[in-house]
C-alpha cells in the first residue's frame, strides 16, 4: 500500500494515497474540531453538494470539499480558519433559512460551533411549501426538509439499487427530487427497498410507521434500543439493525459497514418486520 504524508492543522499524518481529506481527518465529526457533513455517505461516491465540509488547502485559491478531495504528498490542510468558518456559517444559515432542519442530526451543534443564525434571513423558512406526500403504505416524502444532497438519487440509481426511479427535476429554487413526470410513487418503478430512506440526512424521507409515531408524539428515540440480527426472509444473510421501543420493532436499518449489505436492504428486510411482533 502506497502512503502519503500531509499536514492537517499543524500535525503531520500518513494515510493511504487514495484517501480523501475527510478520511485522513478520521471521517465526519462534531464539536470544535470535527468536520461537518450533510451529503456524505460511507458507501456512496461524494457529490460535493452541501459544501459544509470545505477546508483550506495551502496553494488552493478556493476552499475544497474534504469529502471528495484526494490527499496529495506534502499537502497542508486547515480544517478551521476564518475562511472555513465563514463558509460553513453561510451554508448553515442558507440551509436553515430555507429548509426544515429540525430532524437533522448534529445540525444544532454545528449552528452553535459556527455561530450561525438562519433567522437573520427571516423568521419563517422561505421554502417551496407543499403537503407531505403520503401516497403509499411504506414511506412518506416531506420535501420541505430536502437539501438536495443527491444521496437518495444515487442510492436509487447506479451506486446501489439500479432502479433509477428518482432524479432532480426543476431549476433553481424550484429544484426537487421527483419521479419520472412526477407520477405518484405507486405508479413509478419504485421497488420500495427504502434505501433512499437509509441515506437521507434530514428526515425528508421517512417510514410511515415512524412518521405516524412522531405525529402522535409517541416516537421516543432516547428510549429505543438497537439489536443486530440477520434477516430471515432468504439465504443472503443481510444484516439488520432493529430499533426497538416498548418491546416492539419500530424501524429497521442496516449498518453501512456490513460486508453483505453495505447498508442496502430489500422491501422485505426493511419493512417486513410486522411478522416478528408479539401481537
Regions found by a protein language model. Give the residues of each.
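Cofactor-/ligand-binding subdomain signature composed of acidic, glycine-rich
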Residues: 122, 243-279
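N-terminal cofactor/phosphate-binding cores enriched in small/glycine residues
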Residues: 4, 10-73, 86-87
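Extended, non-catalytic structural segments that build the interaction scaffolds
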Residues: 9-11, 141-142
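Catalytic and ligand-binding motifs that coordinate phosphates/metal ions
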Residues: 223-255
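Acidic/polar loop patches that form or flank catalytic/metal-binding clefts of enzymes
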Residues: 34-36, 205-214, 243, 249-251
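Fe-S ferredoxin-like electron-transfer domains
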Residues: 51-54, 60-192, 197-198, 203-230
Amino acid at each position: 500500500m502506497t502512503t502519503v504524508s500531509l499536514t492537517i492543522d499543524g500535525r503531520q499524518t500518513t494515510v493511504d494515497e487514495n484517501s480523501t481529506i475527510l478520511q485522513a481527518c478520521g471521517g465526519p465529526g462534531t464539536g470544535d474540531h470535527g468536520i461537518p457533513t450533510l451529503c456524505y455517505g460511507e458507501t456512496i461516491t461524494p457529490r460535493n453538494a452541501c459544501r459544509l465540509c470545505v477546508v483550506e488547502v495551502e496553494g488552493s485559491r478556493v476552499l475544497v470539499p474534504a469529502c471528495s478531495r484526494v490527499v496529495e504528498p506534502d499537502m497542508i490542510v486547515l480544517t478551521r480558519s476564518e475562511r472555513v468558518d465563514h463558509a460553513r456559517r453561510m451554508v448553515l444559515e442558507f440551509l436553515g433559512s430555507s429548509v426544515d432542519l429540525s430532524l437533522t442530526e448534529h445540525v444544532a451543534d454545528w449552528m452553535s460551533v459556527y455561530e450561525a443564525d438562519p433567522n437573520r434571513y427571516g423568521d419563517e423558512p422561505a421554502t417551496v411549501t407543499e403537503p407531505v406526500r403520503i401516497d403509499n403504505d411504506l414511506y412518506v416524502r416531506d420535501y420541505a426538509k430536502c437539501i438536495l444532497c443527491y444521496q437518495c438519487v444515487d442510492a436509487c440509481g447506479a451506486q446501489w439499487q439500479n432502479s433509477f426511479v428518482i432524479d432532480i427535476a426543476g431549476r433553481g429554487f424550484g429544484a426537487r427530487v421527483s419521479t419520472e413526470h412526477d407520477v405518484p410513487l405507486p405508479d413509478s418503478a419504485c421497488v420500495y427497498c427504502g434505501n433512499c430512506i437509509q441515506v437521507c440526512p434530514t428526515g425528508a424521507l421517512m417510514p410511515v410507521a415512524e412518521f405516524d409515531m412522531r405525529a402522535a408524539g409517541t416516537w421516543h428515540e432516547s428510549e429505543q434500543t438497537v439489536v443486530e440480527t440477520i434477516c430471515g426472509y432468504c439465504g443472503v444473510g443481510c444484516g439488520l439493525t432493529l430499533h426497538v421501543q416498548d418491546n416492539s420493532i419500530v424501524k429497521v436499518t442496516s449498518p453501512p459497514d456490513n460486508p453483505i449489505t453495505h447498508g442496502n436492504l430489500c422491501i422485505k428486510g426493511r419493512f417486513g418486520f410486522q411478522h416478528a411482533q408479539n401481537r
